[in-house]
């Protein structure tokens, strides 16, 4: 638990930038490695410390992650916490050979989605979490294992999802050896009431252990859902710069909840982030220039902070 609470302190919120992984998985214009490094560095300088930096997947099929080793090395040099998606033992072995600090596994909330998109049952997915944790324990016990529950608020195949199943799977992943679990609104079905209720249940399950919520803004509910999550025990939120991203299971999905908007919302609710909005704006400019034609989002980017007021992120340098 000590290692976990050092990375994700329970007494404050943590925002994870997932744009370099989730934000690029469906991107048409892929940024060059140099641009990704500049993006990472500028956002890190703005106070962002946690980055989901890529996926350990075959470079021939996923060229956007071919430079993951280089990105991990840069993150390590900058003392940023890096996480990478590990979908099988081969990915875990690759991750263990790097300086990645967190390995992310995925378990689907529904059997139909698990079989259709991961080619394994939910039980097998939980067992994989256990095997990844065992590999970690043997080779690099300082690394964290993160188990994310996909389709936690609704499934593109099965429809409604029983919250009891989500909580059960989260508990099973913790029992299997995961250090931290997360719940994902993968296809953007959730509303604030459902988010608040499930976060409250997960908070009870996890106790002193933090959990992650991963939100998409498919139907414009992302920022309201993030606020509901904070009000009900969530202290780690995934977001992406400019709302980059999409979901292969949700045609027309507009991506993740916007990182800049989440920072502004959290500060307005009294949750210090230590993140500088001006620095985020500069990082966004780097990403936009590197990805011509890609759609970026954000209410704060469009309107700016409120006029005639002094807005400053609490704790920002």
Outline where the language-model segments fall.
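Catalytic cores and adjacent flexible loops of soluble metabolic enzymes
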Residues: 1-317
């Amino acid at each position: 638990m000590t290692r976990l609470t050092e990375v994700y302190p329970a007494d404050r919120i943590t925002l994870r930038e997932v744009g370099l992984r989730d934000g690029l998985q469906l991107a048409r214009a892929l940024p060059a490695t140099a641009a990704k490094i500049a993006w990472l560095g500028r956002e890190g300088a703005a106070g962002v410390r946690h980055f989901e930096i890529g996926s350990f997947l075959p470079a021939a099929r996923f060229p956007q992650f071919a430079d993951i080793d280089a990105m991990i090395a840069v993150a390590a040099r900058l003392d940023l916490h890096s996480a990478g998606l590990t979908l099988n033992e081969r990915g875990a072995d690759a991750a263990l050979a790097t300086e990645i600090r967190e390995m992310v596994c995925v378990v689907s909330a529904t059997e139909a989605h698990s079989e259709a998109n991961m080619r394994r049952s939910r039980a097998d997915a939980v067992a994989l979490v256990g095997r990844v944790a065992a590999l970690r324990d043997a080779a690099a016990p300082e690394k964290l294992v993160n188990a994310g529950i996909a389709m936690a608020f609704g499934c593109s195949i099965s429809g409604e999802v029983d919250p009891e199943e989500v909580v059960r799977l989260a508990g099973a992943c913790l029992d299997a050896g995961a250090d931290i679990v997360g719940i994902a609104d993968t296809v953007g079905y959730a509303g604030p009431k459902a988010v608040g209720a499930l976060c409250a249940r997960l908070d009870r399950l996890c106790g002193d252990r933090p959990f992650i919520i991963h939100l998409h803004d498919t139907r414009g509910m992302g920022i309201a859902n993030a606020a509901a999550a904070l009000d009900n025990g969530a202290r780690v939120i995934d977001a992406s710069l400019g709302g980059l991203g999409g979901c292969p299971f949700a045609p027309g999905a507009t991506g993740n909840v916007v990182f800049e908007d989440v920072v502004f919302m959290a500060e307005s609710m009294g949750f210090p982030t230590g993140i500088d909005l001006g620095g985020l704006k500069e990082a966004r400019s780097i990403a936009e220039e590197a990805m011509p034609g890609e759609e970026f989002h954000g209410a704060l980017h469009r309107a700016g902070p409120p006029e005639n007021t002094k807005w400053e992120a609490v704790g920002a340098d």
